[in-house]
A protein has these predicted regions:
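Glycine/threonine-rich beta-strand-loop-alpha-helix active-site module
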Residues: 73-178
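C-terminal charged capping/lid subdomain of soluble metabolic enzymes
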Residues: 298, 302, 308-381
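N-terminal small/polar loop signature for handling phosphorylated ligands or for N-terminal nucleophile
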Residues: 41-114, 228-238
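An N-terminal, well-structured beta->alpha segment
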Residues: 1-63
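C-terminal catalytic subdomain
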Residues: 255-321, 327
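Carboxylate- and glycine-rich phosphate/diphosphate-binding segment that chelates Mg2+/Mn2+
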Residues: 149-255
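Short glycine/serine/threonine-rich phosphate/pyrophosphate-binding segments
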Residues: 17-20, 42-45, 72-75, 98-102, ...
Length: 381
């Protein structure tokens, strides 16, 4: 039996942001807890939402102690702030950092026996839905607005841990490309390649099935057609990426990912490397490694990436073509698929052990060892 979970409601398209107020009123919430990051406040992005709340006379409190790779301390501070605010819903504005922090706060508030967020690692044993979350993404990548996952960094132990919990999915997602227009080109590229990684890993993961495949292959097609334009800040590119990353999230949230994400989590934990950039850096190498365990799926990936003449190619040819198309897209949007100057040789073994133990690794289509992961890291150094 396969299970599929999504938001209760989602809004898409330019101008969708007004739905935040509509949903707060319709659901009878009295006060919002706005979780966002300092840069979104600094550059006026969060104000696009809080101005609407002000105009509608909806009370709210703002919490912005959120790092790009959110930490245990960020979550603890957020829980304390939520209690002080006496709010009854969360409006999460941002990328994966804000969304993940909001999910952790919301879960702990309704499941206080798990006050230590580390106790929620893996498939979390919570019993109660989290505080209702209205998620407003400002990046086109993580799709955290539609997923049942969140990732927190344990700074002391230099590791990220993944929490999987059906109780944390936002009740509402408001996916407005206008909220993403202020992203610089480099962030657009990194988060966009993260979305492509979600789509590709979700398509080939062990848990994939017919419904998830439909979402993932369409997400690959949309992202391949849109990311270059989004990096150039065209409206069509932004709109396409807003949709493509959400469609990818609809899929992978329900079936899992693979070793690319496991290795990326470790890179971020050790070197504070942005998650999207880490995923993108690894993707071509991990795709080449996994090819032998993917049957004919790389034929469809190549086709969705826009490769011509796929039907006449041999298995080796279409697999190579799929990897090359992804590598070329990464290059075109300015992603360097190398770890030179980033990873340190003395860290490789422990990083590989940590990646092997990551919650995403078991879904990888090819059986993977610590030694395999070490070889993948070293191949990029």
């Amino acid at each position: 039996m396969n299970k599929f979970m999504l938001n209760e409601t989602s809004y898409h398209g330019a101008g969708a942001i007004t739905a935040v107020v509509d949903e707060i009123k319709a659901r009878g919430f009295a006060k919002a807890f706005v979780a966002t990051d300092p840069d979104l406040i600094k550059f006026g992005v969060a104000a696009k939402v809080t101005d609407l709340l002000d105009a509608a006379a909806i009370p709210y409190a703002v919490f912005s102690d959120i790092k790009p790779n959110p930490t245990i301390e960020n979550v603890q501070n957020g829980v304390a702030a939520f209690k002080a605010a006496e709010a009854d819903c969360i409006v999460a504005i941002g990328g994966g950092s804000s969304m993940d922090t909001a999910k952790a706060i919301g879960i702990i508030m309704t499941n206080p026996e798990f006050a230590d967020v580390r106790s929620l690692e893996g498939v979390a044993p919570t019993k109660n839905p989290c505080v209702p979350i209205i998620a407003v993404p400002t990046t086109a990548g993580t799709a955290a607005e539609v997923t049942i996952n969140y990732v927190i960094t344990d700074v002391e132990k230099k590791r990220k841990f993944v929490c999987v919990d059906a109780h944390d999915i936002p009740v509402v997602a408001v996916v407005d490309p206008d909220m993403m227009a202020s992203m610089p080109a480099s962030l657009t590229a990194a988060t966009g390649m993260d979305a492509l990684t979600h789509a590709i890993e979700g398509y080939i993961t062990k848990g994939a099935w017919a419904l998830s495949d439909m979402f993932h292959i369409e997400a690959i097609r949309i992202i391949a057609a849109s990311l270059r334009g989004a990096v150039a800040n065209t409206p069509e590119g932004r709109e396409g990426m807003a949709l493509g990353q959400y469609v990818a999230g609809m899929g992978f949230s329900n079936v899992g990912l693979g070793v690319d994400h496991s290795m990326a989590h470790t890179l971020s934990a050790y070197y504070d490397m942005p998650h999207g950039k880490a995923c993108a850096t690894l993707l071509p190498a991990v795709m080449a490694y996994n090819a032998e365990a993917t049957g004919e799926k790389y034929r469809e990936i190549a086709r969705a990436m826009g490769v011509q003449g796929v039907d006449s190619m041999t298995q080796a040819e279409y697999r190579a073509a799929a990897v090359e198309a992804v590598r070329q897209l990464a290059e075109d949007v300015g992603i360097v698929t190398s770890l030179k100057g980033v990873a340190r040789e003395e860290d490789i073994h422990q990083m590989s052990v940590d990646a092997y133990n990551d919650a995403c690794r078991p879904g990888n289509p090819r059986e993977t060892s610590v030694e395999d992961i070490e070889a993948l890291y070293r191949s990029l150094m």
